[in-house]
Curated annotation (Swiss-Prot):
It is found in: Mitochondrion inner membrane. This is Cytochrome b. It comes from Miniopterus fuliginosus. InterPro entries: Cyt_b/b6_C, Cyt_b/b6_C_sf, Cyt_b/b6_N, Cytb/b6-like_sf, Cytochrome_b, Cytochrome_b_C_euk/bac, Cytochrome_b_N_euk/bac, Di-haem_cyt_TM. Binds 2 heme b groups non-covalently. It comes from the Eukaryota. The chain crosses the membrane at residues 33-53, 77-98, 113-133, 178-198, 226-246, 288-308, 320-340, 347-367. Pfam families: Cytochrom_B_C, Cytochrome_B. GO terms for cellular component: mitochondrial inner membrane; respiratory chain complex III.
Length: 379
């Protein structure tokens, strides 16, 4: 009699994904972030579901309903801060996951990579709409500024913005629809994750050497289930430390002031995880140009597989490319810092230089250095 694990129509799908999946024997902790993102998504959906039971998506009561959750609902404060800081953990894991893909050449699995880019866009859209829901000052003005960017689209821009707003300004209709989409999108993301994994399991995982590991694979369980479990423990400990000791560390104090359309905050800025893109947007004086640069700052990832000129897949044995990669990381940290600064000298010029360098590294320097390394290795 065959094992139910291998014969049951549903269980065998789980078995082939989580138990008997052949995995490379040498994947490092950088491969933990995929499962950590799954945990983050689970935490966000669960905490979000319970928050939605007490939240009201109405301009008159939204801010007070969030206060009510924190003060009056049993353990409402921990739900709210787990959800807010869980988003930060989500993005930390996301950026490390994408960075891992860039460093080790995982982008050569093009279907998995492209679905990943779509997932990144979907998570960013969800996070943006979630930030609007507490209806504080930064929620309102962030929504106004970011949705207004669509007005830069020629001919249809203004109509498009008013269509999204549901009126002539960010108001009740906007808040209600943002809540609806913020609730819906995580489930669409969960479905996209399934497709992401489906494509990944078609080819199998990459590994730090970038060399096919078919001849040296080990079963996912127990080796990587226990390794993932340790990752979960570390991440949840970090999240709980943040939530229980300094829950407002990454938030904006302006969002503790109820939304007021008549009073603009001195510095409108998004959450920290969008600051690098916001800095790129602000570094271009033209509105349409800024919007295009903003979209391209993420969309540029889609052409990375086409720009892979090295004869090696991974950067493990390419020290010059490694230097360039870490320059890109430093550059992104610089952009994140600039995004949170006021628009004045010297921040403007630093932001412009960092923005140019960001696209230069990905589009020009990486492919050229890879060709040079091929020659140095006489390949």
């Amino acid at each position: 009699m065959t094992n139910i694990r291998k014969s049951h129509p549903l269980i065998k799908i789980v078995n082939s994904s989580l138990v008997d999946l052949p995995a490379p024997s040498n994947i490092s902790s950088w491969w933990n972030f995929g499962s950590l993102l799954g945990v983050c998504l689970g935490i966000q959906i669960l905490t979000g579901l319970f928050l939605a039971m007490h939240y009201t998506a109405d301009t008159a009561t939204a801010f007070n309903s969030v206060t009510h959750i924190c003060r009056d609902v049993n353990y409402g404060w921990i739900l709210r801060y787990l959800h807010a800081n869980g988003a930060s953990m989500f993005f930390i894991c996301l950026y490390l996951h994408v960075g891992r893909g860039l460093y080790y050449g995982s982008y050569t699995l093009t279907e998995t990579w492209n679905i990943g880019i779509l997932l990144l866009f979907a998570v960013m859209a969800t996070a943006f709409m979630g930030y609007v829901l507490p209806w504080g000052q930064m929620s309102f003005w962030g929504a106004t500024v970011i949705t207004n960017l669509l007005s830069a689209i020629p001919y249809v821009g203004t109509d498009l913005v008013e269509w999204i707003w549901g009126g002539f300004s960010v108001d009740k209709a906007t808040l209600t629809r943002f809540f609806a989409f913020h609730f819906l999108l995580p489930f669409i993301i969960a479905a996209m994750v399934m497709v992401h994994l489906l494509f990944l399991h078609e080819t199998g995982s990459n590994n730090p050497t970038g060399i096919p590991s078919d001849m040296d694979a080990i079963p996912f369980h127990p080796y990587y289930t226990i390794k993932d479990a340790l990752g979960f423990l570390v991440m949840i400990m970090m999240l709980l430390t943040l939530v229980l000791f300094s829950p407002d560390l990454l938030g904006d104090p302006d969002n503790y002031t109820p939304a007021n359309p008549l009073n603009t905050p001195p510095h409108i800025k998004p959450e920290w995880y969008f600051l690098f893109a916001y800095a790129i947007l602000r570094s271009i004086p033209n509105k349409l140009g800024g919007v295009l640069a903003l979209v391209l700052s993420i969309l540029v990832l889609a052409i990375v597989p086409l720009l892979h000129t090295s004869k090696q897949r991974s950067m493990t044995f390419r020290p010059i490319s490694q230097c360039l990669f870490w320059l890109l990381v430093a550059n992104l940290l610089t952009l994140t810092w600039i995004g949170g600064q006021p628009v004045e000298h010297p921040y403007i010029i630093i932001g412009q230089l960092a923005s140019i360098l960001y696209f230069m590294i990905i589009l020009v320097l990486m492919p050229l250095i890879s060709i040079m390394e091929n020659h140095l290795l006489k390949w």
